[in-house]
UniProtKB/Swiss-Prot annotation:
It comes from Shewanella denitrificans (strain OS217 / ATCC BAA-1090 / DSM 15013). Catalyzes the attachment of serine to tRNA(Ser). Is also able to aminoacylate tRNA(Sec) with serine, to form the misacylated tRNA L-seryl-tRNA(Sec), which will be further converted into selenocysteinyl-tRNA(Sec). One of its GO terms (cellular component) is cytoplasm. HAMAP family: Ser_tRNA_synth_type1. CDD domains: SerRS_core (cd00770). One of its GO terms (molecular function) is ATP binding. This is Serine--tRNA ligase.
Length: 428
């Protein structure tokens, strides 16, 4: 979340920067809340000082043998008033904090202003889309013909936007995840991590899914007096980043680099009618996530590095893609700067998102109280957090099926995956 102090001292400038990403900050309401907070703060401090002074006089009066019953009653009355003001102040601070928790991150100055994805900037492009001398099929037709993608069974078992994979396509899907993890751990310096698929509310608050995006989650257990509710993770970013929640990291341990392959679960609220065909938008999907925890001065360079790590997967698989710098109006809630990787899908004759790599700066760290000890003054300071897909496994499978298809409907296995496929070079 944004620094509440910054909201108070730089309210107009903050509102202007947030407006560039289509968010209207109610400055009048916040100003009113701040004035009330100041007033309550003064009243609370004055009542506290008065009670302390009078309490001190009780001991002096007792030493003189005086009756202190009237003073005791006065202290009790002041205590009641003080408790009431403290409760009022706490309620107000909660309201201010809720606004801060529901306000998106400030865009970095290097992010182009724009209203939506049409104003994103292409940074670079790799590979040349293949020219086919036969009619191109989409991944759904290819996968069903091969007997590897079974949507009908998934609908029967669960419902729409789920998949059953079989045989060599299931193996290819597994091979992709293994290849990605090996690349990131052996060449890019990430620590492979196994994490829970269920997380509590504090974790979702820490990474920014709550309170604003609760409808996008699959909630499995409601909150009770015994404990917090549990929800399925929408991305491994949540458990990986929360590894440093309420922690002071030694500067010598930075950067921290985590990767995990997990199933991810999203309700896709608001996406009705979009990408209803095939694997592009599923309620359950596999993803290899990359997370970096770094010092503030290192985070922008870390974003470039993390993005290149995700790009390397596409390059080794021989999949054409382009790298897009998102404009202010298209960035995610917690991001300060984001690159999207878009892979070429010949059946759609367009590039589609396959990875999103973001620098959150201290937005998540402030929520999580994730800190490191600054060597300059030996005091705890907020870390910066970054995350990205390296990659979405299902969408990578889609890209391979479409880009490596042959005229007879078979699929050529990319060279880098042969060892993960037991030497299989052709599916079909």
């Amino acid at each position: 979340m944004l620094d509440p102090k910054f909201l108070r001292t730089e309210l107009d400038a903050t509102a202007e920067r947030l407006a560039s990403r289509g968010f209207a900050l109610d400055t009048a309401h916040l100003s009113q809340l701040e004035e009330t907070r100041k007033s309550l703060q003064v009243e609370t401090e004055e009542l506290q000082a008065s009670r302390n002074a009078i309490s001190k006089s009780i001991g002096q009066a007792k030493s003189r043998g005086e009756d202190v019953s009237a003073i005791m009653a006065q202290v009790g009355d002041l205590g009641s008033k003080l408790d009431a003001k403290k409760a009022e102040l706490a309620e107000l601070l909660h309201a201010i904090n809720l606004i801060a928790m529901s306000t998106p991150n400030l865009p970095d100055e290097s992010v182009p202003c724009g209203k939506d994805e049409t104003e994103n900037l292409e940074v670079r492009r790799w590979g040349t889309p293949r020219s086919f001398d036969f009619p191109v099929k989409d991944h759904l037709d290819l996968g069903e013909a091969l007997g590897g993608l079974d949507f009908k069974s998934a609908v029967k078992i669960t419902g729409s936007r789920f998949i059953v994979m079989k045989g060599q396509l299931a193996r290819l899907n597994r091979a992709l995840g293994q290849f990605m993890l090996d690349l990131h751990t052996q060449e890019h310096g990430y620590t492979e991590t196994y994490v829970p698929l269920l997380v509590n509310e504090d974790s979702l608050l820490g990474t920014g899914q709550l309170p604003k995006f609760g409808e996008d989650l699959f909630h499995t257990k409601p909150a009770t007096e015994e404990g917090q509710g549990l929800s399925l993770i929408p991305t491994a970013e949540v458990p990986l980043t929360n590894l440093v929640r309420d922690t002071i990291v030694e500067v010598s341990d930075l950067p921290l680099k985590f990767t995990a392959q997990t199933s991810c679960f999203r309700s896709e609220a608001g996406s009705y009618g979009r990408d209803t065909r095939g694997l592009i938008r599923q309620h359950q999907f596999e993803k290899v996530e990359l997370v970096q925890i770094v010092k503030p001065e290192d985070s922008m360079q870390a974003l470039e590095e993390l993005t290149l790590h995700a790009e390397k997967v596409l390059q080794l698989l021989g999949l054409p893609y382009r790298t897009m710098l998102l404009c202010t109006g298209d960035m995610g809630f917690g991001a300060s700067k984001t690159y999207d990787l878009e892979v070429w899908l010949p059946a759609q004759n367009t590039y589609r998102e396959i990875s999103s790599c973001s620098n959150m700066k201290d937005f998540q760290a402030r929520r999580m109280q994730a800190r490191y000890r600054n060597p300059e003054d030996n005091k705890p300071a907020l870390l910066h957090t970054l995350n990205g897909s390296g990659l979405a496994v299902g969408r990578t499978l889609v890209a391979i099926l479409e880009n490596y298809q042959n005229a007879d409907g078979s699929i050529t296995v990319p060279d880098v995956l042969h060892k993960y496929m037991g030497g299989t070079t052709l599916i079909g």
